[in-house]
């Protein structure tokens, strides 16, 4: 579907304007969040996996669960019915729940209900007339996958000589410098203790989440990893 917005409008967070179908607000600070799960391992050994796409407010606060009437279930069926089976196939490889926490479907339902329903540009009133129910969620999942494909965190780290290891330790600044050399912006790194397990890539948006232009920006704050002694552990098939 097309939003009809184009990509020449104002960048999100550039003004205090109210949210519209073509200007994302108040959640104009957008995070593409990725997991690195090693215990239990999820996803390919040479790729991070998708956590979600979150609309933070420009000051770093955020809203959640913005429209319970659109808490869709059966995301697989929704995607398949609306011609997005390629997106679904990719999600089944790269957007995976921790098996201890539930099914992939449950993670997708949670990410849409908790975060997806909060985008001003994904309100049902923004959809082309005659759009099927859930079309805005399909557009959300398609965009998350599209954006994730532009953020090959594993490849970027290994390009800079940083590889998963159970013994090597890194400083926060060395990891972010390596990623900045590849991506041009600095992400936020989160850890479980001192083990790197999540990364946040930040954007402002011009236009709609459906088909707008995501402009990468550096993280406005650091993640919770320590300043040194960080390990990027390998995925060891510890299932």
From Swiss-Prot:
Keyword tags: Disulfide bond, Endonuclease, Hydrolase, Lyase, Nuclease
UniProt cross-references to CDD domains, sorted A to Z: RNase_T2_euk
Catalytic site positions: 51, 111, 115
InterPro entries associated with the record: Ribonuclease_T2_eukaryotic, RNase_T2-like, RNase_T2-like_sf, RNase_T2_His_AS_1, RNase_T2_His_AS_2
An annotated GO cellular component: extracellular region
Gene3D superfamilies: Ribonuclease T2-like
Catalyzed reaction equations: a ribonucleotidyl-ribonucleotide-RNA + H2O = a 3'-end 3'-phospho-ribonucleotide-RNA + a 5'-end dephospho-ribonucleoside-RNA + H(+)
SUPFAM superfamilies with a match to the protein in the record: Ribonuclease Rh-like
Known EC number: 4.6.1.19
UniProt record similarity statement: Belongs to the RNase T2 family.
Function: This is a base non-specific and adenylic acid preferential ribonuclease.
Protein name per its UniProtKB record: Ribonuclease Le2
Organism of this sequence: Lentinula edodes (Shiitake mushroom)
């Amino acid at each position: 579907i097309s939003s009809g917005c184009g990509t020449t409008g104002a960048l999100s967070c550039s003004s205090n304007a109210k949210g519209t179908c073509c200007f994302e607000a108040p959640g104009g600070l957008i995070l593409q969040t990725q997991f690195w799960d090693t215990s239990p391992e999820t996803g390919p050994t040479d790729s991070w996996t998708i956590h979600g796409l979150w609309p933070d407010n420009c000051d770093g606060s955020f809203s959640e669960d913005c429209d319970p009437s659109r808490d869709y279930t059966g995301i697989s069926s929704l995607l398949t019915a609306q011609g997005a089976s390629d997106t679904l196939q990719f999600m089944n490889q790269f957007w995976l729940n921790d098996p201890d926490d539930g099914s992939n479907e449950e993670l997708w339902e949670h990410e849409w209900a908790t975060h997806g329903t909060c985008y001003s540009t994904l309100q049902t009133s923004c959809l082309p007339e005659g759009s099927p129910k859930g079309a805005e969620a399909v557009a959300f999942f398609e965009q998350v996958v599209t954006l994730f494909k532009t953020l090959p965190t594993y490849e970027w780290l290994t390009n800079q000589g940083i590889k998963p290891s159970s013994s090597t330790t890194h400083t926060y600044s060395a990891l972010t410098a390596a990623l900045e050399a590849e991506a041009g912006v600095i992400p936020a790194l989160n850890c479980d203790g001192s083990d790197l397990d999540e990364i946040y890539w930040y954007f402002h948006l011009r236009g709609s989440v459906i088909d707008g232009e995501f402009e990468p920006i550096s993280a406005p704050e650091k993640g919770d990893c320590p300043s040194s002694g960080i390990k990027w552990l390998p995925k060891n098939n510890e299932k």
